[in-house]
Amino acid sequence: VVKLLMWEIGKNLKDSEKEFDRTVDYINETIKEYKKIDRDGAFFHNNSGVRALIRRGPLGVVLCLGPYNYPLNETFALLIPAIIMGNTAIFKPAKHGVLLIAPLLEAFKKSFPPGVVNIVFGRGREIAAPIMETGKINVLALIGHSSSAISLQDLHPQKNRLRLVLGLEAKNPAIIMDDADLELTVNECLNGSLSYNGQRCTA
């Protein structure tokens, strides 16, 4: 997977390894959180004289659309919570970063029943639009541009019932305090701005 990240989207070895490791860590942490949520759901909670049992369950079909610049980490940040909570996922990889999906397909086949994780390939406008028009998507999970999110929502026949998980064109300022270590701060700001040629929402 690391080599495929390097070959297809041009990440260097260090950044590709970091993306892979971050993804594995994220999956493990998500599983831990799910177990905690599951345990909490077995107990009644008291609040202001109200005794309640909180149960969380699947929402239905989730359409996951990840970005090309972090095709493993950011896409799995959408996909993994969806399937862990019992949803069915339709997952469309970004147009760049599809080669790494091949070895992962085998893992999905071994780990989940048929139809739980569904992967479609193609251009976003041509693939995602007709899927949204069916009205069978319960959750749109997208990391990308706000114009894409708006146009996809508008295609859904019941967009008032559509749940959204969106990460859209972030801009992140760096606030440097008077007591900051300037050498460390400058290095971190440069790394944050210029890693992967600045093609990242945290630049």
Tell what function each PLM region has.
Residues 1-50:
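N-terminal Rossmann-like NAD(P)+-binding subdomain of aldehyde/semialdehyde dehydrogenases
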Residues 5, 86, 117, 140, ...:
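Residue-level signal for inorganic ion chemistry
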Residues 27, 101-104, 131, 152:
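Hydrophobic packing residues within well-ordered alpha-helices of enzyme cores
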Residues 40-115:
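Conserved small-residue-rich beta-alpha loop and adjacent elements
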Residues 51-52, 119-138:
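A structured beta-alpha segment of the ubiquitous adenosine-cofactor-binding alpha/beta core
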Residues 80, 138-143:
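Periplasmic-binding protein-like
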Residues 111-112, 139, 147-203:
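ALDH superfamily catalytic-core signature
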